[in-house]
């Protein structure tokens, strides 16, 4: 569906590796990043997106005349939309294979996301397939573009995504180095389980997060839980 809306608004697509092959296999046109940058992937794919043509196109400020002159001089095209799915690091951890785990630490993806999120005034960044429908609606509403408010929300979500991803890498490395002194900083990354009926007081909002992707609590009956209901449930457990 996302490819359909991109085609509808004549968006030129850049992609790499397996994504490039899949897009073309589905019958849509895309340009391989190595062709766009004129720089091949190296080190078994470890280096494929680090190039000024990409980061310049993402990071330059559209209303900055100095930036405009620089990108024109070195022939950099603007990049208005960045869509990235990170390597499945958490799934790799479950295998227990250290080599596989290390190779699934995504470097290029989070870097692209952070660049796009920093320049949210001009760039839309997508980090979750659940955001595709919202993006499609925005592009249809704004004739191929998106609103600033939408981009700001996505920027926040993008930094949450990279922060969570780094937290999981840190957790793995902490467990792999049990004999080392405790780290000076501690990161905690959680996933939203559900939004509660209200917080400690009826006028407050509340949500439940889990350190894992799922939480082993099942509500058998009754209305939706509030913050106080959840606290009492956990106490009784």
Go through the PLM ranges and name each one.
Residues 1-32, 121:
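N-terminal phosphate-binding or glycine-rich loops at protein starts, especially the Walker A/P-loop
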Residues 18-89:
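Glycine-rich nucleotide/cofactor/substrate-binding loop typically near the N-terminus or early
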Residues 48-55, 88-97, 116-117, 213-227:
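Gly-rich Lys/Arg/Thr-decorated short loops/hinges at beta-loop-alpha junctions or inter-strand turns
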Residues 62, 107-110, 230:
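Catalytic, metal-anchored helix/loop core of enzyme active sites in primary metabolism
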Residues 76-198, 203-205:
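Internal alpha/beta core interface subdomains
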Residues 235-237:
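Conserved small/polar residues in nucleotide/adenosyl-binding loops
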